[in-house]
Swiss-Prot record:
EC code: 6.1.1.21
Catalysed reactions, semicolon-separated: tRNA(His) + L-histidine + ATP = L-histidyl-tRNA(His) + AMP + diphosphate + H(+)
Origin: domain of life: Bacteria
Subcellular location: Cytoplasm
Keywords for this protein: Aminoacyl-tRNA synthetase, ATP-binding, Cytoplasm, Ligase, Nucleotide-binding, Protein biosynthesis
Transmembrane feature ranges: none
Gene (UniProt): hisS
SUPFAM superfamilies, per the entry: Class II aaRS ABD-related (SSF52954), Class II aaRS and biotin synthetases (SSF55681)
Name under which the protein is recorded: Histidine--tRNA ligase
One biological process term in Gene Ontology: histidyl-tRNA aminoacylation
Length: 423
């Protein structure tokens, strides 16, 4: 027997029993985003490597350690580790944002070479939103309110907390960086080699360290909010006022900086305590300089991304009775001479007249006992049964597989009307 081939570590299959929950969550995401007037875009999963180096930052962990990169002839290419850079590239390339506002969303796989663990995988899926051309804090508030509406639709709104911060302008952040480095240089004895490297290359990332001793020290570190420029401070205060007005609860987290270099002003995360260490389910912020940095015109921008794997885990944890639709609603079984054609015709009739229902036709033969076992296993609500007598009398037997009403024999012309009363 040939050796079996396994999935790559950190890249997972989605089983037939799992996909209905994924589909339901993705449907809630699409419904909420479409209800706000946002438009879907689709980008390639492979981009030119310099796109991410320029957008995300060469000294970030994502670019320096986690990207899947390869050579195609003389061009270096990368499997996308996030969606914002590719969306900005597409918007510039196709002129979507020239003298124009755009509110866009996407869903798709991303790739990072990280250590796989619960809620963190090497291939993972994100739903992302990018808004271009709006500088006002109203759009910051809209994105946060939009995500809260999604949490309510998913039944997880009581299990997530909003954390907010402002990291100001590039100049304000540079001033803060100098103050933070000056403070941390006196505590290098508490740092790992990796943290010492960050102190030189990307000191703001030390603010979200998991080192408990360093966390205690950081409680007395300079606060980023104290270094904000006036414009960023006013922007942040207006955002907080808008969230207060619609009763969105939040915590101001002065250590929140996000892991990518392109952010400025508002940054936010939705976090949960229900998933252990992988507590962030959604994060984003403003990136007003990124479009110009990638060759476009100066364009105020803001976005977020949410991890679908973590949303699936969170829904399973806190909302296990979510009303996920079965993959099969109606199962058609048949046995005897002349029943095959009748069963095919009936299944197609149901699919044509009741397209919102999922109808499966038994195709693997066997007696009725075997077929009903398959029907039960499918999760269907109804079985439509055709035997030789039903063909002769132009009738169908309707069997309720989930209990409830008794089995009924109906004239073929009345079957569709009856099915409609059961769903």
């Amino acid at each position: 027997m040939a050796k079996t081939i396994q999935a790559i570590r950190g890249m997972n299959d989605c089983a037939p029993t799992e996909s209905p929950l994924w589909q339901w969550i993705e449907a809630q995401v699409r419904n909420v985003l479409n209800s706000y007037g946002y438009s879907e875009v689709r980008m390639p999963i492979v981009e030119s490597t310099p796109l991410f180096a320029r957008a995300i930052g060469e000294v970030t962990d994502v670019v320096s350690k986690e990207m899947y990169t390869f050579w195609d002839n003389d061009e270096q290419l990368t499997l996308r580790p996030e969606g914002t850079a590719g969306c900005v590239r597409a918007a510039i390339e196709h002129g979507w944002i020239y003298n124009n506002e755009q509110r866009l969303w996407y869903i798709g796989p991303m790739f990072r070479h990280e250590r796989p663990q619960k809620g963190r995988y090497r291939q993972f899926h994100q739903a992302g939103v990018e808004v271009f051309g709006i500088a006002n804090p109203e759009i910051d508030a809209e994105l946060i309110i939009l995500t809260y509406r999604l949490w309510k639709a998913l039944g997880i709104d009581q299990h997530v907390t909003l954390q907010l911060n402002s990291i100001g302008s590039l100049e304000a952040r540079a001033n803060y960086r100098s103050a933070l480095v000056g403070f941390l240089e006196n505590h290098q004895d508490l740092m790992s080699d990796e943290e010492k490297d960050r102190l030189v290359k990307n000191p703001l990332r030390i603010l979200d360290t998991k080192n408990p001793e360093l966390q205690k020290v950081l409680d007395n570190a300079p606060k980023l909010l104290d270094y904000l420029d006036d414009e960023s401070r006013e922007h942040f205060e207006q955002l907080c006022s808008l969230l207060d007005a619609v009763d969105i609860q939040y915590e101001i987290n002065p250590k929140l900086v996000r892991g990518l270099d392109y952010y400025n002003k508002t940054v936010f995360e939705w976090v949960t305590s229900a998933l252990g260490a992988q507590g962030t389910v959604c994060g984003g912020g403003r990136y007003d300089g990124l479009v110009e940095q990638l060759g476009g015109h100066a364009t105020p921008s803001i976005g977020f991304a949410m991890g679908l794997e973590r949303l699936v885990l969170l829904v399973q944890e806190v909302n296990p009775n979510v009303p996920v639709k079965s993959a099969v609603d109606i199962y058609v079984v048949y046995q005897g001479e002349g029943t095959t054609l009748a069963a095919f015709e009936l299944a197609e009739k149901v699919r044509s007249e009741l397209p919102h229902l999922n109808t499966m036709l038994h195709c693997s033969g066997g007696n009725f006992k075997k077929q009903f076992k398959r029907a039960d296993k499918s999760g269907a609500t109804l079985a439509l049964v055709i035997g030789e007598s039903e063909v002769q009398n132009k009738q169908v037997v309707v069997k309720h597989l989930q209990g409830g009403a008794d089995q009924q024999t109906l004239d073929l012309v009345n079957v569709i009307d009856y099915i409609q009363t059961q769903f």
